[in-house]
């Protein structure tokens, strides 16, 4: 109830037309069925079409966004073994009643530049002793860890970033930058 009141406040006061709501114990069904939010885009880390019950929506306002697409694209991009099938499935995923949001970089992991610049995370300077963030970044430094001035490395990194964005744009679902 508190979450829906907060979302309604932001919608009415500031004209916000969509929300990304991630975390445990989110009342997905309650928010998805809320009459005042049916024209508002709601993005969750998990939702299934059961939230609609018997009534299938005219406007698909509920979407999911998780890192599955990101992991598949990054693994395929760096040529991990046996990734073509997983990449193709992730690219074609488009559930009938719930929108799928795809991304190759987000707020809780490597940026796209970091994905092509580092094999390992380097968070030593932030006071967390490099314990924060995921160890599974599916990244490849293109031949040199961190910033580089070598033209060949920079060129390969640019190509890899363009490849990642092309895979994002050509996949089914909604691309998120």
Regions found by a protein language model. Name each.
Residues 17-19:
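Hydrophobic residues within beta-strands of alpha/beta enzymes
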Residues 15, 28-177:
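Conserved alpha/beta catalytic core and glycan-binding cleft of carbohydrate-active enzymes
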Residues 1-14, 24-27:
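Substrate-binding/active-site clefts of carbohydrate-active enzymes
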Residues 21-24, 45:
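Generic beta-strand/beta-sheet core signal
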């Amino acid at each position: 109830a508190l979450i829906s009141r907060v979302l309604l406040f932001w919608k009415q006061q500031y004209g916000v037309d969509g929300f990304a709501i991630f975390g445990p114990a989110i009342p997905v069904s309650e928010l998805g069925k809320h009459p005042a939010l049916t024209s508002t885009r709601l993005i969750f880390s998990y939702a299934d079409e059961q939230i609609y019950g018997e009534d299938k929506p005219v406007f698909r306002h509920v979407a999911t966004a998780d890192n599955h697409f990101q992991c598949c694209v990054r693994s395929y991009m760096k040529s991990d073994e046996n990734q073509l099938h997983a990449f193709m499935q992730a690219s074609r995923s488009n559930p009938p009643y719930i929108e799928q949001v795809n991304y190759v970089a987000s707020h809780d992991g490597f940026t796209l530049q970091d994905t092509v610049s580092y094999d390992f995370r380097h968070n030593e300077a932030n006071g967390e002793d490099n314990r924060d963030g995921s160890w599974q970044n599916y990244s490849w430094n293109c031949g040199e860890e961190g910033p580089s001035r070598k033209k060949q490395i920079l060129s390969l990194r640019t190509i890899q970033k363009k490849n990642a964005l092309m895979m994002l744009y050509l996949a089914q679902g909604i691309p998120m930058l």
